[in-house]
Structures are given as structure tokens and as C-alpha cells.
């Protein structure tokens, strides 16, 4: 049994739906609020959360008349209190308040808090059986088996909000799970798709941040340049759809129009296409099992002219290979992969290591973790958070020698 519904069997939604958005002030949250703004008669906002942008969070709370608002930074409680003065909006600050927001009675929850901080709030929504649009990678990369098992036990419906996984979700509706032979996740190839290994090694921060198609935050843009993001998506797909590593392929598709494909036993391949705009997969989740009017640009294939595909290069982009290695190792290895990558990207942004050293730090951390005998099943959110914490410490310890090798 899967928490991800592969057939649109639910009845259509009637009346007003209650909505909570965890991470309302981030890029995914912004796209979600834009869709809610377009149809205020269909949605009522139950709860909103943000990290530290109190002004933006309070503005959204007032606009949508949210019932509860939480800011993750406990030091911002006074600022939030002042910003909401004169309203009847309830509020709180700190992790417990964010978890309270997630646990409030909303029909549909957008889980878009970035990083490991998003795991416990997402679980709070899952545990009460909510429909959860999942945009937080760490829930799956750091605690995939545990998270999905909890969702099944609680009767929670998980809707993939990431563009590639939402594409697979839509394509999978064309057949049955036992008829699937493989899924194909597409990758733009990032700004270094045609670069040599030597040039990629020396790439600057400014060059890594020039994504050809998507407008995203700094961290994910660098992950796209290294193809670590595609590795994370391979891991997510495995947990979301109960797929083995051998059932997941990656194709480089520079136009970013085909977001995912599913091949079935009869060798039919069903693909989902759309403009590179996060409002498309979010709208699909928000309307599911129905379709709602979109806000993104319509797709004009004649204007695009051609769609091209190529195999990924695991030598120039070893981060993708490492994701498959971590997935096969299991027992927390994917958590280590993600944690080490976050340390490596932060070091690259701080100009402590070269771009090419990102994958080397991830590989060295994974190898050191396995040699130390640290692989073990994750039975709780606290287990996942502990592995994440300790893997970050290990990566930080290995960082100086990685930096020294590159100098």
C-alpha cells in the first residue's frame, strides 16, 4: 500500500477547502499563495509559517485572514506580535509553534519548509491524516522509509509537489504499478552541461548560479549545476513510488519541458510536459483529483521548436552516481549524502573549496561513514535528525583536507 495515490479515484472537492502553508514566505510558498490568491472563494487559510521574514509572513496572514501564524525563529516572537497587533490572528514562535501550525485542522497542507527543520512539521500534518503536498526533500531523502510508513499508517495522502515527481505522479495514473518497468526523471543539465571536467572543477560561484531555465534559490541552483539535485530527486522517487534504483533513469533534457516519463510493460512511454514554472505542479496538487485553472504560461511547442535528450555523464557529474550508491547502501546513507552536500555547498559559497570539490566531500563523507560502521535503520524522526547532525559534523571535519587537496 502506498501513501501516494496512483489513481484519481477520490470524489471531486465541493465547497471551501481549508489550507495550511508551511514555508509560506519561501519560493514554493510564494507560488502556492499566488494560486490561492487567484481563487479566494475556494480556499480558507488555516495556518501559515515562515522562517524569519516576519513582515512578509504578517502581510500574508492579514491578506488571507489566516487563523494561526508561526515564525520558526523564536527570537522574532515580539516582532510578530507587533506586526499582528489589532488582528485576531493567533500566533507563535519556535519549532513547537511551527509543529502546532502543521497539526491544525486543514484539509490540505503544503509542506515547503526547507531543510531538516521541515521533517517534524510534515510528520505532524501526516499523523492527523491530512493531504500533504510534499515539497520538502529532507522528508524523503533523510527519512524516506519511516516517513512513508507513517503516512500509510495515518491514512495521509502524499502528493508530490516537486516538478519531476509530480510529472511521474501524473504519468503513473495512465497505468497500474505492477505494469511499470521504469521511470525517467529529466534534468536540464545546468549551466555546465557542455563544459569539460577541468572547466567544471574551476567553475566560479557566479557561473554556478546562472541556471539556463529555472529561477530558484542559491542552494538549489548550485545543486542543479553539480547535478546533486537530480541525485536527491532519484532518492525521493525511490521512496515516493517504492522503486528500486534500477527502475529509475535520468535523462538530460536542456529545454526543461518534459519533466518526467513512465515506461510501462507494453513499452508505451507516458510523459508530462509543461513550462518550467513551479505553479504547474503546485496547481495539480492543489486541485487534485480535479484540475484547476492555472497561472503559468501555456506551452507553445511550435515556438520551442525542438526537444532534445542525452544521457547524463557520471564522470563529469559524480554527484548523480553517488546518489545511486547511497540509495543502494540504505540505512541512513541517503541522509549522509544530503548532509554532506549541504556542508559542501556552504563551503563553496564561502569560497573555501572549488566547485569540483563538492562531490569529493560528499563521497569522502559517505565512505568514512560506512567504514565507521554507522549505517543503521532509521526508526524515528529523531534518528534521522541525529544522523543528519552527525554527518554534517563528519563532513565539516573532512572539509579542511578536501580544501587542501584542491589548493
From Swiss-Prot:
**InterPro entries, per the entry:** DXP_reductoisomerase, DXP_reductoisomerase_C, DXP_reductoisomerase_N, DXPR_C, DXPR_C_sf, NAD(P)-bd_dom_sf
- Top-tier EC class: oxidoreductase
Which SUPFAM superfamilies does this one have?
1-deoxy-D-xylulose-5-phosphate reductoisomerase, C-terminal domain, Glyceraldehyde-3-phosphate dehydrogenase-like, C-terminal domain, NAD(P)-binding Rossmann-fold domains
Supply the alphabetized keyword list: Isoprene biosynthesis, Manganese, Metal-binding, NADP, Oxidoreductase
Molecular function per GO: 1-deoxy-D-xylulose-5-phosphate reductoisomerase activity; manganese ion binding; NADPH binding
Q: Which cofactor does it need?
A: Mg(2+); Mn(2+)
Q: Which GO terms describe its biological process?
A: isopentenyl diphosphate biosynthetic process, methylerythritol 4-phosphate pathway involved in terpenoid biosynthetic process
Residues recorded as binding 1-deoxy-D-xylulose 5-phosphate, renumbered to this chain, are 137, 163-164, 188, 211, 224, 229-230, 233
Q: Which residues of this UniProt protein bind NADPH?
A: 25-28, 53, 136, 138, 217
Pfam name, any one: DXP_reductoisom
Give the top-rank taxon of the lineage listed in the UniProt record for this protein. Bacteria
EC number from the UniProt entry: 1.1.1.267
Q: In which pathway does it act?
A: Isoprenoid biosynthesis; isopentenyl diphosphate biosynthesis via DXP pathway; isopentenyl diphosphate from 1-deoxy-D-xylulose 5-phosphate: step 1/6
Q: Where does Mn(2+) bind?
A: 162, 164, 233
Catalysis: reaction(s): 2-C-methyl-D-erythritol 4-phosphate + NADP(+) = 1-deoxy-D-xylulose 5-phosphate + NADPH + H(+)
Family named by the database record: Belongs to the DXR family.
Question: What is the role of this chain?
Answer: Catalyzes the NADPH-dependent rearrangement and reduction of 1-deoxy-D-xylulose-5-phosphate (DXP) to 2-C-methyl-D-erythritol 4-phosphate (MEP).
* Protein name, UniProt field: 1-deoxy-D-xylulose 5-phosphate reductoisomerase
Supply the source organism for this entry.
Rhodopseudomonas palustris (strain HaA2)
Amino acid at each position: 500500500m502506498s501513501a501516494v495515490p496512483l489513481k484519481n479515484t477520490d470524489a471531486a472537492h465541493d465547497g471551501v477547502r481549508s489550507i495550511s502553508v508551511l514555508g509560506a514566505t519561501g519560493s514554493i510558498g510564494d507560488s502556492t499563495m499566488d494560486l490561492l490568491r487567484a481563487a479566494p472563494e475556494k480556499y480558507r487559510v488555516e495556518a501559515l509559517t515562515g522562517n524569519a521574514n516576519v513582515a512578509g509572513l504578517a502581510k500574508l496572514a492579514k491578506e488571507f485572514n489566516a487563523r494561526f501564524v508561526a515564525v520558526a525563529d523564536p527570537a522574532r516572537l515580539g516582532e510578530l506580535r507587533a506586526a499582528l497587533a489589532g488582528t485576531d490572528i493567533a500566533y507563535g514562535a519556535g519549532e513547537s509553534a511551527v509543529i502546532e501550525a502543521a497539526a491544525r485542522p486543514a484539509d490540505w497542507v503544503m509542506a515547503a519548509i526547507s531543510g531538516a527543520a521541515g521533517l517534524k512539521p510534515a510528520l505532524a500534518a501526516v499523523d492527523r491524516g491530512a493531504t500533504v503536498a510534499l515539497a520538502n526533500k529532507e522528508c524523503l531523502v533523510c527519512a524516506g522509509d519511516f516517513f512513508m510508513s507513517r503516512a500509510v499508517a495515518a491514512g495521509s495522502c502524499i502528493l508530490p509537489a516537486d516538478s519531476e515527481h509530480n510529472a511521474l505522479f501524473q504519468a503513473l495514473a495512465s497505468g497500474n504499478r505492477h505494469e511499470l518497468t521504469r521511470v525517467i526523471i529529466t534534468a536540464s543539465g545546468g549551466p555546465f552541461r557542455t563544459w569539460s571536467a577541468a572547466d567544471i572543477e574551476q567553475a566560479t560561484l557566479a557561473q554556478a548560479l546562472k541556471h539556463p531555465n529555472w529561477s530558484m534559490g542559491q542552494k538549489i541552483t548550485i545543486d542543479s549545476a553539480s547535478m546533486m539535485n537530480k541525485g536527491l530527486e532519484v532518492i525521493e522517487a525511490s521512496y515516493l513510488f517504492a522503486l528500486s534504483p534500477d527502475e529509475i533513469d535520468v535523462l538530460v533534457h536542456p529545454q526543461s519541458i518534459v519533466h518526467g516519463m513512465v515506461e510501462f510493460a507494453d513499452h508505451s512511454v507516458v510523459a508530462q510536459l509543461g513550462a518550467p514554472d513551479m505553479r504547474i505542479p503546485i496547481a495539480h496538487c492543489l486541485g487534485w483529483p480535479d484540475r484547476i485553472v492555472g497561472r503559468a504560461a501555456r506551452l507553445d511547442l511550435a515556438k520551442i521548436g525542438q526537444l532534445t535528450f542525452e544521457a547524463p555523464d557520471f564522470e563529469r557529474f559524480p554527484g548523480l552516481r553517488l546518489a545511486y550508491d547511497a540509495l543502494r547502501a540504505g540505512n541512513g546513507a541517503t541522509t549522509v549524502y544530503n548532509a554532506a552536500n549541504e556542508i559542501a555547498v556552504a563551503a563553496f559559497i564561502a569560497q573555501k573549496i572549488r566547485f569540483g570539490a563538492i562531490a569529493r566531500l560528499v563521497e569522502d563523507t559517505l565512505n568514512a561513514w560506512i567504514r565507521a560502521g554507522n549505517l543503521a535503520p532509521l526508526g524515528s524522526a529523531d534518528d534521522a535528525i541525529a544522523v543528519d547532525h552527525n554527518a554534517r559534523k563528519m563532513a565539516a571535519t573532512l572539509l579542511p583536507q578536501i580544501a587542501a587537496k584542491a589548493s
